[in-house]
Amino acid sequence: MAVITKIEVQKRSKERFNVYIDKGQGEEYGFSVNEVILIKHGLQKGLEIDEIALGNILYNEEVQKAYLQAISYLSYQMRTKLEIEDFLRKKEVGQAIISEVVSKLLHDRYINDKEYAILYTRTQSNVNRKGPTVIKRELLNKGVQDLIIMHSLQEYTKEKQIENALILIEKKKKSYQKHSFLQMKLKLDEMLVRKGYSRDVIQICLEELKDEKDDEKQQEALHYHGNKYYEKYKKYDGWTFENKMKQALYRKGFSIDEIEIFLQMKREEG
């Protein structure tokens, strides 16, 4: 049995208190607690506490400490239940305490995976223009349940997905100006897959791109790559030269007809 002999406020933190006790051998430092724990256990000078009571006090102090760490972590941005659990594990908090902290955070509505999923979906679709597949994968990695994700993605309509995908295409296609139209389409297709769009949405968007095909830019790309390969393969004669040229340009996405026209032009120049 110990008796509390003195309680004083810590100099560096007004919300924490040092508790001094006497176990029969004079006053000594016992432990420190948060103000919440001080009030919860009614700690005051003269109070007698046994080993069981002391164990409860120290356990609740650890819970409160972990709770405040979680609150601080949440102050930067919303987090999922799993993210909070992972954060506390990295802080070497025990599982029993983690469970209590998470339960309290859920009760106090500091964490809510449903709200998180809705806001995350809106941000990733409106700001980063990610497709549903990527958003779903990221939410699953954050521990959000399938049903919650399905609900959050309902407001991400197909029309909005097409709008976002077309914006991405418009931004990216400028960097493919020296590619053939076919190769540009393939690269844009790959980009949209990485961004998380469905095959259906990608097909619709690339069909719209087909209507915008620029013959002049296609010719510029053909001449750019054709002249580059011409310099590379001009050391070869006849059939070998033409075969290497055709293979190289075909791999770049140009049609046989386009390649034949280019080679004919080179023959006439020669």
Swiss-Prot record:
Principal location: cytoplasm
Sorted UniProt keywords: Cytoplasm
Compartment annotation: Cytoplasm
The keyword Ion transport belongs to this UniProt entry's keyword annotation: no
Top-level taxon in the UniProt lineage: Bacteria
Matching Pfam families: RecX_HTH1, RecX_HTH2, RecX_HTH3
GO biological process: regulation of DNA repair
Database matches in InterPro entries: RecX_HTH_1st (IPR053926), RecX_HTH_2nd (IPR053924), RecX_HTH_3rd (IPR053925), Regulatory_RecX (IPR003783), WH-like_DNA-bd_sf (IPR036388)
NCBIfam families with a match to the protein in the record: PRK14135.1
Function: Modulates RecA activity.
Family: Belongs to the RecX family.
Name of the protein in question: Regulatory protein RecX
Phylogenetic lineage: Bacteria, Bacillati, Bacillota, Bacilli, Bacillales
Gene encoding the protein: recX
